């Protein structure tokens, strides 16, 4: 099933790229972004629509947890709407920040009301009872995961490789704990096929349609499996990318000084001379190593 999803996406992406070019469904580069990205203007976007929809299809066939599929669908709608508005308006502005945050929060709340998770967390072997505060924590996990993957999607191939480098080890970790969430691998197969066309020079971008959905799925899975804190270790790069934005904004507002040349962090490395390929390679290897270290520490691999 995983191989079938990979092959299906590999076959369909060239068709989708041609269709999007014909329909002029292209990326609009934000003005405050690096000047180095100007040549990417017009590259087909919303490419995540394919690996998400095929992932949803194979997820239903594989009897993936209904709540995961629902979360996947809700966050897909948010990402799709954001990209759609950007294409229609012919600029980089889709949903406004507060609109996106509101929709993500509402989606996460719907998920939590339906899931009704236990209110304890596993803090690396120690069980902590959070009571009603857990719902706020879980809300932050789901929305934060969605935004973190969205922030990571700024270079050709980056978000895709980070997802693959973290989701496969994460699947093995969950399997060791007696939990099977094959949607992680099913989506990973689609993302791998997508990367054939997204690695530099990208022929298509996943857009918010892809990145917001991937992050939403990861957050939902972590809440369902009570592995919220472990998720951070399998996806350290998105966490670091998010922290770089928070620190940059906070530093500028309080001290009127920037810590990085630009945030998220991958843009900082671009502006100090690193090539996109180098940044993607270093970030991916770092994320993969951190994931493998987690598997080693918790005895998943000998």
Swiss-Prot record:
GO cellular component: plasma membrane
UniProt pathway: Cell wall biogenesis; peptidoglycan biosynthesis
Keyword Thylakoid among record annotations: no
Molecular-function GO term, any one: phospho-N-acetylmuramoyl-pentapeptide-transferase activity
Protein's cellular compartments: Cell inner membrane
Pfam families recorded: Glycos_transf_4 (PF00953), MraY_sig1 (PF10555)
PROSITE patterns, alphabetized: MRAY_1, MRAY_2
Main location: membrane
Keyword Methyltransferase in record: no
Enzyme Commission identifier(s): 2.7.8.13
CDD domains: GT_MraY
Membrane-related topology note: Multi-pass membrane protein
Reaction(s) catalysed (UniProt annotation): UDP-N-acetyl-alpha-D-muramoyl-L-alanyl-gamma-D-glutamyl-meso-2,6-diaminopimeloyl-D-alanyl-D-alanine + di-trans,octa-cis-undecaprenyl phosphate = di-trans,octa-cis-undecaprenyl diphospho-N-acetyl-alpha-D-muramoyl-L-alanyl-D-glutamyl-meso-2,6-diaminopimeloyl-D-alanyl-D-alanine + UMP
Keywords assigned: Cell cycle, Cell division, Cell inner membrane, Cell membrane, Cell shape, Cell wall biogenesis/degradation, Magnesium, Membrane, Metal-binding, Peptidoglycan synthesis, Transferase, Transmembrane, Transmembrane helix
One GO biological process term: peptidoglycan biosynthetic process
Superkingdom of origin: Bacteria
Transmembrane segments: 1-21, 42-62, 68-88, 123-143, 154-174, 178-198, 204-224, 229-249, 279-299
Cofactors demanded by this protein: Mg(2+)
HAMAP family: MraY (MF_00038)
Function comment: Catalyzes the initial step of the lipid cycle reactions in the biosynthesis of the cell wall peptidoglycan: transfers peptidoglycan precursor phospho-MurNAc-pentapeptide from UDP-MurNAc-pentapeptide onto the lipid carrier undecaprenyl phosphate, yielding undecaprenyl-pyrophosphoryl-MurNAc-pentapeptide, known as lipid I.
Similarity remark: Belongs to the glycosyltransferase 4 family. MraY subfamily.
NCBIfam families xref list: mraY
Protein name: Phospho-N-acetylmuramoyl-pentapeptide-transferase
Native organism: Thermotoga petrophila (strain ATCC BAA-488 / DSM 13995 / JCM 10881 / RKU-1)
């Amino acid at each position: 099933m995983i191989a079938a999803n990979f092959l299906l996406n590999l076959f369909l992406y060239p068709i989708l790229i041609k269709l999007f070019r014909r329909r002029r469904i292209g990326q609009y580069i934000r003005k405050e972004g690096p000047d180095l990205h100007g040549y990417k203007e017009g590259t087909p976007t919303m490419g995540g629509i394919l690996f998400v929809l095929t992932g949803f299809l194979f997820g239903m066939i594989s009897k993936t947890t209904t709540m995961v599929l629902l979360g996947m669908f809700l966050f897909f709608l948010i990402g799709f709407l954001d990209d759609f508005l950007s294409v229609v308006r012919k600029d980089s502005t889709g949903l406004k920040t507060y609109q996106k945050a509101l929709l993500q929060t509402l989606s996460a709340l719907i998920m939590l009301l339906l899931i009704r998770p236990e209110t304890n967390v596993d803090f690396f072997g120690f069980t902590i009872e959070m009571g009603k505060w857990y719902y706020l924590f879980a809300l932050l996990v789901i929305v934060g995961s969605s935004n973190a993957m969205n922030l990571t999607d700024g270079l050709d191939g980056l978000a895709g490789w980070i997802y693959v480098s973290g989701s496969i080890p994460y699947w093995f970790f969950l399997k060791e704990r007696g939990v099977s969430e094959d949607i992680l691998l099913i989506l990973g197969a689609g993302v791998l096929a997508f990367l054939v066309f997204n690695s530099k020079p990208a022929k298509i971008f996943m857009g918010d349609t892809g990145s917001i959905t991937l992050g939403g799925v990861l957050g939902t899975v972590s809440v369902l499996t009570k592995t919220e804190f472990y998720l951070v270790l399998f996806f350290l790069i998105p966490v670091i990318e998010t922290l770089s934005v928070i620190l940059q904004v906070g530093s500028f507002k309080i001290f009127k000084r920037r810590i990085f040349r630009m945030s998220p962090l991958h843009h900082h490395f671009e502006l100090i001379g690193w090539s996109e390929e180098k940044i993607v390679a270093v970030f991916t290897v770092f994320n993969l190593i951190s994931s493998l270290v987690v598997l080693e520490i918790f005895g998943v691999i000998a």
